[in-house]
Amino acid sequence: MDKNGAAQKLIAIFGHMDFIGLLHSILVETSKYIIIILFAIYTWHCFSVFVGNNTEKKDKVYRRQNKIMYTIHFICTAVLFLNSLDVTILGLYLAQLALLIFVNKAYIYVYENASKMVLNNMLMLLMIGFVMIGRLNREHLIRQMIFAAAICLIGLFIPLLIEHFSYFDRFGLVYAVIGILMLALVFVIGKTIYGAKNWIVIGGFAMQPSEFVKIIYVFFVAAWLSKSTQWKDVIKVAVLAGVHVLILVAEKDLGAALIYYITFLSILYVASRNIGYLGLGLFGGSAAAVVAYHLFTHVQTRVTAWRDPWGTINDAGYQVAQSLFAIGTGGWFGMGLGEGMPNKIPVAETDFIFSAISEELGAFFAICLILVEISCFIMFVNIALKIKRRFYKLTSLGLAMEYVFQVFLTIGGVTKFIPSTGVTLPLVSYGGSSVISTIILFCIIQGMYVLNCKEEESLETQQETDASKRRVRKR
């Protein structure tokens, strides 16, 4: 049966089209408030688990978060389905639901000590991305689901690899060479998309090497600085890190260049605890930004759009102006899923997906989304602070900074807080390279959390054994 035939059959079942339209209107209007309330409760739980050590109580919170996620997913799908009566939406929903349930159950089954908060947030952000990308572009949704499913399956083994392979800190120079070669590859076979020559197209799929290299890059900096922070070693790692950044600047991928630079400074400061390095780095970065503004016309264009999007609305400022229109139109509660016009925003499903979310789901939902992203960062930092191995500690902190700074650049750009840098919102925006690298990031953090839990359990067992031996000797 074709789509039209299925729609006609559904209409016949419910009586007539007016009833469907009325049902849809009621559902859209009520659902946006229900979704906001549910997401607010989920967000509250993201922070409530940081207080107290009651494991049983926290497990109840995690299970409640899962129920909230599945409920929001169902409501959003119901609204989108009634909007078009396209049965394909139901098929995609079932596939998404199967993926979310499988990943949730599989990770907990394989890793008993897995951080349920990290897992829950990863799945919640993925789900929001599925809903919004499906609302904007069905073909892109299918691709996103394929990429997410594949990397979630592969990512299941990443914590296992981290647990059983303890030599990651020995290959600092190797990581640097691999990263530089991968970034430089675009000069040979790269393509220019959206003004930046940082894409490689293979079999119809476009990917950004910088998204994958940013993981290797953190391993490189952490491996080097975990061994020494003497001046000569800092100079060496700074030069190699600078090569990464300069290649990205040459490719006109300034958003990624900023992320790499800030990540390097963060790891350097934490490793050395030298405020002088941080001050010198920030001064050098500011000077480089001024130079980039005068050298690159596309940087000048973005700064102009940031300073006065309304005055350049027919040219450079069109994208930012449409983004602000969408956010303003949505207000606090949103237009309702499917009721806005996010397609008027250029690249709404990638760089500007936060604007589309704000328009249809409202500012309250968008603020909760920001808070969930922040809770991810806090959780990453908490995990890093508990880790005793210096390399893993620096790696976790570096990945945390990469994640939160990318969120800042994305949301700051679409809200006119800073000039747009062309980076995506992790796990939410469409993009195979982005979703793959971010899930890998979450899995690495998960692996380090699991490893640390096992080491703590082993230490406690050893301490209990030693205490028992001492008691026996006293007798």
Give the ranges of each region predicted by the language model:
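Short, strongly hydrophobic alpha-helical membrane anchors
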Residues: 1-24
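Membrane-helix interface and helix-disruption motif detector
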Residues: 17-31, 81-92, 136-143
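N-terminal secretory targeting signals
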Residues: 22-34, 109, 458-475
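N-terminal signal-anchor/start-transfer transmembrane helix
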Residues: 32-51
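Extended repeat-based interaction scaffolds and adjacent low-complexity, acidic/S/T/P-biased segments
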Residues: 52-59
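Hydrophobic alpha-helical transmembrane segments of multi-pass inner membrane proteins, especially
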Residues: 74, 86-315, 355-415, 440, ...
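TM-adjacent membrane-interface loops and short helices in multi-pass inner/ER membrane proteins
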Residues: 309-350, 354, 363-365
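Transmembrane alpha-helices of multi-pass inner-membrane enzymes
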Residues: 416-461
